[in-house]
A protein has these predicted regions:
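Short hydrophobic beta-strand element within catalytic cores of glycosyltransferases
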Residues: 329-332
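Nucleotide-activated donor-binding/catalytic signature segment of Leloir-type glycosyltransferases, i.e.
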Residues: 272-292
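Conserved donor-binding/catalytic core segment of Leloir-type glycosyltransferases
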Residues: 184, 221-239, 245-248
Length: 409
């Protein structure tokens, strides 16, 4: 079976991009002939992870330079590069807009599939951000709600012809998506958002695949004081790091004055977040590491006990099952894909992500758990994550879905 996997850009390392590459490796391991096609490619960050899978790209990222620009809409004439050579394939899988609707408008190959990490937020801010839509008004000073109001929902974005979410662009996207042969979503939450954005479509859920390392047993509870807390995320406002910093500052002042927060990731909000840490008086306890390799993230994880991340309207969040697989106790938001991963709070603490007090209380609740409860929670979280997100579980589900379309290995 010949498979083409389409993605607009492989320059920064995010959950959607990691999942796309892992799916490509899984399909290749099942015996398919797989090629990845993307506009922009950063070999320094991706070559090792991609391995032997061929990558066709239009422009390479130059180290130290900004990533090359990529098409932002399916009508961009540069989309022709992404859709080239599809006639020779049996299956094409699009990841991320505008590859999704562009593939739906194409006539080849026989099976055109969109793996939906989330519908494009800038086109469908209300449909894809139900939590922010319902809660932005109660926390107007928080950066996430402010970003929702002033950027995602800006009046300029809705202007005819020139607006990013103009009626014309939304209509073109919907036509393309409805032309697809199949849609797979990364969570039940995303499936519902797809239906809110595009109407009543047949959407199947295929959970992302997570590699779980064979680590030493972390039984033995937690140290009582001086906890290491890890967060891994892109530093942008919808990831809600400002609330996490506020909550951590309160937790540190009230419950654990020797605790430290390790922030892994990069993004445009970093300078403002570093300044916020200084204003809160926790600059010495918050460590901004920037981008780290998988090996360095694993090493840092081994020195931490808790994982905390509070993204707003997160469709899935690869970092949550990854943290569970490393034996970290997990704190996440009370909605979206993370709530689904944490089984409604059974496998970790879930809190109101716009309340620093709730964040501090959640961290304290985990930190004060008995050793027996800590070990039970770690074991339950790891078992559940492996059952849903392991390579074996994903391969079994993927085979079943493809067989419905006469695609076998």
């Amino acid at each position: 079976m010949k498979i083409r996997i389409l993605h607009p850009s492989l320059c920064h390392v995010g959950g959607a991009e990691i999942l796309m590459v892992e799916q490509a490796r899984l399909l290749a391991g099942l015996g398919a002939s797989v090629r990845i096609r993307t506009f922009a490619y950063d070999a320094e960050r991706w070559a090792q992870r991609v391995g032997s899978i061929p990558v066709d790209f239009s422009k390479a990222r130059i180290p130290g330079k900004r990533p090359p620009s990529v098409p932002r809409f399916p009508a961009d004439r540069r989309m022709g590069f992404l859709l080239d050579d599809l006639a020779s394939a049996d299956l094409a899988i699009a990841h991320n807009y505008p590859a999704s609707s562009a593939l739906g408008a194409a006539s080849k190959p026989r099976l055109r599939l969109w793996y939906c990490h989330e519908p494009p937020r800038f086109l469908y801010p209300d449909e894809v951000s139900p939590f922010l839509r319902q809660n932005a008004a109660r926390a107007p000073s928080r950066h996430g709600p402010r970003y929702f109001r002033t950027s995602m929902k800006s009046w300029f974005g809705a202007l005819p012809f020139v607006g990013r979410r103009s009626a014309r662009r939304r209509a073109a996207d919907r036509v393309g998506v409805r032309g697809l042969d199949a849609i797979w979503a990364n969570s039940e939450y995303t499936r519902e958002n797809v239906r809110q954005a595009y109407g009543s479509l047949d959407v199947e859920v295929l959970y992302p695949m997570v590699e779980f390392p064979n680590l030493p047993d972390r039984r033995g509870g937690l140290p009582r004081g001086g906890l290491g807390i890890l967060t891994v995320t892109r530093l942008e406002w919808v990831k809600n790091l400002d609330t996490l910093l506020d909550g951590f500052a309160l937790f540190r002042r009230r419950d654990d004055p020797r605790s430290e927060l390790h922030v892994v990731g990069e993004g445009p909000a970093r300078p403002a977040l570093e300044e916020l840490a200084r204003q809160l008086g926790i600059a010495d306890a918050v460590h901004f590491h920037g981008f780290l390799s998988d090996a360095l993230v694993a090493e840092l994880s081994s020195r931490c006990q808790l994982f905390a991340c509070l993204p707003l309207d997160e469709p899935f969040g690869m970092v949550f099952p990854e943290a569970m697989g490393r034996g970290l106790l997990v704190l996440g938001p009370d909605h979206g894909g993370p709530l689904e991963t944490l089984d409604g709070g059974r496998l970790g603490a879930v809190v109101d992500p716009l309340s620093p007090e709730a964040v501090a209380d959640g961290l304290a609740r985990l930190a004060k758990s008995s050793d027996t409860e800590v070990d039970r929670l770690r074991s339950a979280a790891l078992d559940a994550a492996r059952q849903r997100f392991s390579r074996e579980a994903t391969a079994k589900r993927m085979r079943s879905l493809l067989e419905r379309y006469g695609m076998g290995f």
